[in-house]
Amino acid sequence: MRIAISTGGGDAPGLNAVIRAVVLSAHYRGWKSYGIQRGYEGLLSFNGVVPLGLAEVRGITHLGGTILGTTNHGNPFRYVMRNEQGEAYEQDRSDDLVAAFQASGFDALVSIGGDGSLQISHDLWRKGLPVVCVPKTIDNDVSGTERTFGFDTAVSTATEAIDKLHSTAESHDRVMVVELMGRYAGWIALYSGLSGSADVILLPEIPFDIEKVCDKIRRREAAGRHFSIVVVAEGARPKDGSIELLERRGVGTVDRLGGIASKVARAIEHHTGKETRSLVLGHLQRGGSPTTYDRLLALRFGSAAVRAIADRAFGTMVGLTGSDISRVALENVVGRAWNVPLNCDTIRTARDLGISLGD
């Protein structure tokens, strides 16, 4: 058995742990493993297939990033090409990818990725490519699994940043607005905001009223608390407003969210007169060594993916259900983002602690 491994989309702490688990689990079954570099680019645009043995994955569990590299621009169904004038256009090269996969003599693919990669894998599976998926995103927004690796590390990083903002905000009697990743799901903002004792948490799932946000800050001021911490998810939006974008979808790309923290900070300063600063934590949330939880989850996902291949359970994704690793059909995963339920215990906890959610 020859299996290929690919990592697509944004990087997340724990990717290397998955790769190591797949390679080791395959090795002890007598199988050979190969890595496709930079997502599917290693099959489509250059000779990027590398053997992965015990030596190649030794000592990588604790490393952030991915030893295979990754990209957000390698969708074979929307592959970016350029004409003679240098203008970019999209072309469907999925058949080329399947042909290259077969020509390489692979028997199965372990695709590690988020919602975009899962959609690609589903469409490739429908073309006959034998694939098993491992969910990967710091956003924790993939349906079919209660947790994705990378999320715990991102929350830890964000919480540490919020902790540090408290001292500078209090020293200057300022309002600090920190923008966190998550795209259209507020998991990172909710978990880190709650853990970091934020005063306001703004989520994509709950459109906010800026006056409600300012009212919370005024009440703290009246109580002698002359600083406030506002945590805002990048996909949060005001009532009757739109999501802030840094860049709209172009050829081979998706919308880039961002800018809401600056907008909220300006509004707070205008309505309250309080000196307000904004901070975008950005890609720090993707970096660093994975937490113990993320390492363990990634290792479990990787070994479960190999077991799925052994059972020829292609067209599935491994996921966490309760305390067990399960398999979910890709057709029941794609196009079904998992957002924060409005009645979940964590939301209720935030409200019970007096945290404003802007509504």
Regions found by a protein language model. Give the residues of each.
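Short beta-strand segments
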Residues: S6-T7, I36-Q37, G69-T70, S111-G113, ...
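Short, acidic/small-residue loops that bind anionic groups at enzyme active sites
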Residues: R29-G30, Y34-Q37, L124-T148, D152-V155, ...
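Accessory alpha-helical/coil subdomains and C-terminal extensions
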Residues: A99-A100, A108-G113, Q119-D123, F151-H172, ...
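Short glycine/serine/threonine-rich phosphate/pyrophosphate-binding segments
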Residues: A12-V22, L43-L44, P76, Q91-D95, ...
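A cross-family phosphate/adenosyl-ligand binding-site feature
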Residues: M1-G8, N16-G105, I112, G116, ...
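Glycine- and acidic-rich phosphate- and metal-coordinating loops
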Residues: R277-Q285
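Flexible loop/turn connectors
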Residues: A298-A310
